[in-house]
């Protein structure tokens, strides 16, 4: 199981010991998209969804998702997050909504999982609030776009054209 930090020498899952690591500023940015019917997109854009302010509720859900990541992902460390910024971008061409989340902490381990969880929970909330009018929505392209800090240094995803 060489290279997989969540397994010990015997192949058993364990939480990685980060006690000896240096505390640094950690930042992760993740992104994802939900595609939908034009009529569903219009309801969100125009603020006319039956359940209320879809993106406002999804923003709060995404923040809560980042904060609760360690409760959902068994081997994640509980972290004291210093910032969770959630942005939704309406995309007429899809039609759909992009969710971009930046998570920050000052600690011994990264916040990539918190950023990914926040994106997923935000997009799942959009789905939940609109499923009565569009059960065919698709959540797609969820990924870490950038991470900063820590021993491994900074990393940025390269967009690969079709």
Curated annotation (Swiss-Prot):
<feature type="active site">
    <location>
        <position position="128"/>
    </location>
</feature>
<dbReference type="InterPro" id="IPR002820">
    <property type="entry name" value="Mopterin_CF_biosynth-C_dom"/>
</dbReference>
<comment type="subunit">
    <text>Homohexamer; trimer of dimers.</text>
</comment>
<dbReference type="Pfam" id="PF01967">
    <property type="entry name" value="MoaC"/>
</dbReference>
<dbReference type="InterPro" id="IPR023045">
    <property type="entry name" value="MoaC"/>
</dbReference>
<comment type="function">
    <text>Catalyzes the conversion of (8S)-3',8-cyclo-7,8-dihydroguanosine 5'-triphosphate to cyclic pyranopterin monophosphate (cPMP).</text>
</comment>
<feature type="binding site">
    <location>
        <begin position="75"/>
        <end position="77"/>
    </location>
    <ligand>
        <name>substrate</name>
    </ligand>
</feature>
<keyword id="KW-0456">Lyase</keyword>
<comment type="pathway">
    <text>Cofactor biosynthesis; molybdopterin biosynthesis.</text>
</comment>
<dbReference type="GO" id="GO:0006777">
    <property type="term" value="P:Mo-molybdopterin cofactor biosynthetic process"/>
</dbReference>
<dbReference type="InterPro" id="IPR047594">
    <property type="entry name" value="MoaC_bact/euk"/>
</dbReference>
<dbReference type="InterPro" id="IPR050105">
    <property type="entry name" value="MoCo_biosynth_MoaA/MoaC"/>
</dbReference>
<dbReference type="GO" id="GO:0061799">
    <property type="term" value="F:cyclic pyranopterin monophosphate synthase activity"/>
</dbReference>
<feature type="binding site">
    <location>
        <begin position="113"/>
        <end position="114"/>
    </location>
    <ligand>
        <name>substrate</name>
    </ligand>
</feature>
<comment type="similarity">
    <text>Belongs to the MoaC family.</text>
</comment>
<dbReference type="InterPro" id="IPR036522">
    <property type="entry name" value="MoaC_sf"/>
</dbReference>
<keyword id="KW-0501">Molybdenum cofactor biosynthesis</keyword>
<protein>
    <recommendedName>
        <fullName>Cyclic pyranopterin monophosphate synthase</fullName>
        <ecNumber>4.6.1.17</ecNumber>
    </recommendedName>
</protein>
């Amino acid at each position: 199981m060489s290279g997989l930090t969540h397994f010990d020498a015997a192949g058993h899952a364990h939480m990685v010991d980060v006690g000896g690591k240096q505390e640094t500023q950690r930042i992760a940015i993740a992104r994802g998209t939900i595609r939908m019917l034009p009529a569903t997109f219009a309801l969100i854009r125009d603020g006319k969804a039956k359940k209320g302010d879809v993106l406002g509720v999804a923003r709060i859900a995404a923040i809560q998702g980042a904060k609760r990541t360690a409760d959902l992902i068994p081997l994640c460390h509980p972290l004291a997050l210093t910032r969770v910024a959630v942005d939704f971008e309406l995309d007429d061409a899809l039609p759909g909504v992009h969710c971009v989340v930046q998570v920050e902490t000052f600690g011994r381990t990264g916040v990539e999982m918190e950023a990914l969880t926040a994106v997923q929970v935000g997009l799942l909330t959009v789905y939940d609030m609109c499923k009565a009018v569009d059960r065919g929505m698709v959540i797609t392209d969820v990924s870490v776009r950038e991470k900063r800090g820590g021993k491994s240094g900074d990393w940025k995803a390269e967009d690969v054209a079709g």
